[in-house]
Amino acid sequence: MPSDGLTLEKCMSAARSLRQQGMNKKAIEMYRQALQFDPENLEALNELGLAHIHIGEQSEAIFAFDLAIDIAPNDYRGYSNKAEAFLTLGAFEDANAVADTGLQLAPQSSELWIKKARALESLLKIQEAVDAYNEALKYDSSDPEVWKALALCLDAQQNWPAVARAYRIAAGLHEKRGEMQDADSCLKFAEMAEQS
């Protein structure tokens, strides 16, 4: 057990604060201290793994996510995070397989559909990636980055009207967030697609 008056809550709070500041190695130490209080804490395991990804320690991240999955095999977050680790490794088949396992548990998870789409796109399975992005958008259509990723896949298919539509939607979402430079960029891409 950690000493110095630390509690699980204090360790988690400190770890999250450090991670937000980009101090991932120090955050990892605090997550490890949190896990001394509760070795099966899913939040700590998942966040520990994400911190490992940010500093390029994918093997350690996958280990943390595997522990989370072993503890709670019906919680989709471990699968989503493990898929992210595989994506950052370039292990796209593995990322797709893990995303599929997670989707069996949470078929309406936009997050898992996006990870699947990214894996398929990287495997150059463009139509399958388009289908997966469209599934993600069924459950959460508020992220302009997903619309832009879809637009890139549609661009590879030279489906210009659909490319323009996706970029225009992304532009509108950026505009709502006050991200005018991103909105303008999306509008330019939409206009280019409309002229193709």
What kind of region is each of these model predictions?
Residues 6-43, 47-54:
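Alpha-helical segment of the N-proximal tetratricopeptide repeat
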Residues 8-9, 42-43, 76-77, 110-111, ...:
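Helix-start (N-cap) detector for alpha-helical repeat units in TPR-like alpha-solenoids
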Residues 21-32, 55-67, 89-101, 123-135, ...:
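Structural signature of tandem alpha-helical TPR/SEL1-like repeats
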